[in-house]
Design a protein with these regions (language model features):
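Histidine-centered active-site loop/cap adjacent to the catalytic His
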Residues: 349-381
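Residue-level recognition of beta-strand->loop/alpha-helix junctions
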Residues: 124-128, 302, 338-340
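A structural motif corresponding to the C-terminal end of an alpha-helix
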Residues: 284-299, 328-335
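Membrane-embedded segments
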Residues: 84-187
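N-terminal secretory targeting modules
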Residues: 1-89, 146-147, 381
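Substrate-gating cap/lid alpha-helix
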Residues: 305-338
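Secreted/periplasmic serine-hydrolase-like ester/acetyl group-modifying domain
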Residues: 58, 170-294
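Short, solvent-exposed loop/turn segments at secondary-structure boundaries
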Residues: 102-105, 311-316, 349-350
């Protein structure tokens, strides 16, 4: 059947009138619906992290330390800071030496400090792998609740044992916790991430929502984004993965009774970086200033470094470096202790004590006059 031109034109006109305006295939929202969506998104962005802190159970017990698997969960670290500040008068801050890399939670420095005090006064806020550049960022952006407290902060000389550890090599070096170091200034020579990654890291520090989203990914989705998680778990409900239960710190295969000599570790000839040239020492000094600016009473513990592990020339250089560090602390009226070197068999490696080593270190601190007057508020004889 052949349509006349008039009929065909009439049909085409009717079709044009019925055409849907150009748009995507997604559901279209009206102006009012867009406003509602914007309100919901804004509420989630602003209130989500705070509400989640009330929903997700976080009730640490004695000797709590951030689980090793959650070392990159800075949002949870901030939450832990708030909890610790409400329960303890003294916070012990530092890297894996404070965290207790080779010992159980009840063999750490904070545990033995509490044992010597005969009460729970000291909280373990150490995190595995936190060199001074990263620790400074962690406390600046996620440790704001640490204010008006006693703070024992440990400086590990290992971070000055080479230009690489000091982040000064021009060749790219993938160090721990790059999101926490200064992204643009001062320049860190070995840090080569793209501008977009640096900018994203800088923004995340100031927007709690991003830290919260990272927390959810790390705790519940195996530290991968949701789209990839659903690909790896096609038959699982993502909501079912959100159990509201945080992992606990496990003490599996710690080998805490194996010393460095029993492990067959040889003496080292470390190529120490002078304090005046050291980036890590510079960042550590800035962290002391930050803690003081927040009205904290700061006490620095230098070491305990395994000097038994040093070859003669390296040992001589280390003693000079240690003296320069002490001189700076004295000039700037920073209370400190450089504890005596522990017996060789109480070290696991260059900087980590074994359980008995932590017990001895705690006793050394309680016998130190500066520690007594600064942290224990006990006057000298």
């Amino acid at each position: 059947m052949k349509l006349s031109s008039t009929t065909r034109d009439k049909i085409m006109n009717e079709a044009d009138k019925a055409k849907v305006p150009f748009s995507s295939n997604n559901i279209r929202l009206s102006v009012g619906e867009w406003i509602i969506a914007a309100i919901v998104c804004t509420a989630l962005l602003c209130l989500g992290p705070a509400l989640w802190g009330r929903i997700e159970k976080f009730d640490p017990g004695a000797d709590y330390r951030l689980p090793y698997t959650l070392g990159n969960d800075y949002w949870l670290y901030g939450r832990n800071c708030r909890w610790a500040c409400s329960k303890y008068d003294t916070l012990v801050v530092g890297d894996s030496v404070i965290w207790g890399h080779y010992v159980s939670a009840d063999n750490t420095l904070s545990h033995y400090l509490n044992q010597n005090a005969a009460q729970d006064r000291f909280a373990n806020l150490g995190v595995d792998g936190f060199h001074p550049a990263a620790l400074g960022g962690l406390l600046r952006y996620y440790g704001g609740d640490i204010s008006g407290k006693n703070v024992i902060i440990q400086f590990n000389p290992l971070w000055m044992s080479s230009a690489k550890h000091d982040l000064q090599t021009e060749k790219e070096f993938r160090f721990n916790h790059p999101k926490l170091v200064p992204q643009f200034f001062p320049r860190i020579p070995c840090y080569k991430d793209s501008f977009s990654k640096r900018f994203s890291a800088a923004v995340e520090r100031y927007v709690p929502f991003f830290g919260w989203a990272s927390h959810l990914r790390i705790v519940y989705f195996e530290n991968i984004d949701l789209s990839n998680w659903t690909l790896e778990h096609p038959y699982e409900n993502p909501l079912g993965a959100v159990t509201l239960e945080l992992p606990i710190s496990r003490d599996d295969d710690l080998q805490e009774n194996v010393s460095w000599t029993e492990k067959g570790i040889s003496q080292e000839d470390f190529q120490w970086v002078e304090p005046a040239q050291s980036l890590q020492w510079r960042f550590f000094r800035q962290t002391i200033d930050l803690l003081k600016a927040r009205n904290n009473t700061v006490f620095v513990v230098v070491g305990p470094f395994n000097e038994h592990m040093l070859k003669p020339d390296s040992y001589k250089t280390y003693q000079k470096m240690k003296s320069e560090i002490q001189m700076w602390l004295q000039r700037n009226n920073v209370a400190y202790c450089v504890p005596p070197v522990l017996p060789s068999d109480l070290y696991r490696d260059a900087s980590h004590p074994l359980g008995q080593g932590y017990a001895m270190l705690a006793r050394q601190l309680f016998e130190n006059q500066s520690f007594k007057s600064t942290i224990l508020n006990v006057s000298g004889d």
